[in-house]
């Protein structure tokens, strides 16, 4: 089922197991994983919807992500993020929510319209479901924190989640940067090393957990990220909506 088309790029929902295998293969490559199946797959693939962005000229899958919908926060403990974060603060959330995960783009693709197509599709989904909160895990490549100290310092200073929504520590290995990091931020360096997807979320008013999880399986550090739709700056929202 087609969601949206931007130029030569089309976003659609996966409609077969073959589609899901294609997404898992792209994720495997993008995330630099290593296993005999050459797929990035887990149990959540069976319960999520998969959004595929294809180049209609080459008929090639170039970007994908998956979503999991919630009517409210009551069942947020069944989300992927809840494996790593204590999300009890969000259980009383009354509005519809969507978890977004496994976002990746083919490394050979440099056209910014691909990301715009992905966001236009997500905007369509959010609007149709009257979603108020998008959430997920935003990853930093690798598990060595030193490269990202300025980025974490910037998150600490400007983007920590409000108290009533803030996830608590659950994972065994974390970097509690809000407490343990005594570091004066170099903003230029912080933005340079900040993951591009997280930068996009932050520009739309997103907030993050006060700690990062060390994910040895994916070989990443990640922070819980929440974005309240009603708080997205109008200029940013219009940029995406104009594509739909």
Task: Place the predicted regions along the sequence by residue.
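Long, contiguous binding/interaction regions
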Residues: 233, 237
């Amino acid at each position: 089922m087609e969601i949206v088309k931007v130029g030569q790029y089309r976003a659609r929902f996966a409609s077969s197991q073959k589609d899901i295998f294609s997404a898992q293969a792209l994720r495997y490559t993008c995330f630099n994983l290593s296993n005999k199946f050459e797929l990035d797959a887990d149990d959540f693939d069976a319960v999520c919807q998969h959004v595929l962005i294809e180049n209609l000229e080459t008929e090639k899958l170039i970007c994908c992500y998956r979503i999991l919908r919630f009517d409210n926060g009551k069942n947020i403990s069944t989300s992927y993020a809840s494996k790593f974060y204590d999300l009890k603060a969000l259980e009383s959330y009354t509005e519809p929510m969507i978890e977004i995960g496994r976002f990746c783009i083919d490394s050979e693709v440099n056209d910014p319209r691909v990301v715009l197509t992905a966001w236009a599709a997500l905007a369509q989904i959010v609007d149709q479901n009257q979603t108020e909160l998008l959430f997920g895990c935003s990853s930093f490549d690798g598990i060595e924190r030193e490269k990202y100290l300025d980025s974490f310092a910037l998150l600490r200073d400007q983007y920590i989640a409000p108290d009533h929504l803030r996830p608590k520590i659950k994972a065994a290995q974390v970097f509690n940067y809000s407490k343990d990091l005594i570091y004066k931020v170099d903003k230029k360096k912080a933005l340079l090393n900040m993951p591009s997807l997280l930068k996009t979320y932050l520009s739309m008013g997103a907030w993050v957990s006060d700690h990062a999880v060390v994910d040895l399986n994916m070989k990443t550090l990640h922070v819980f990220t929440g974005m309240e739709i009603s708080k997205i700056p109008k200029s940013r929202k219009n940029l995406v909506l104009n594509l739909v």
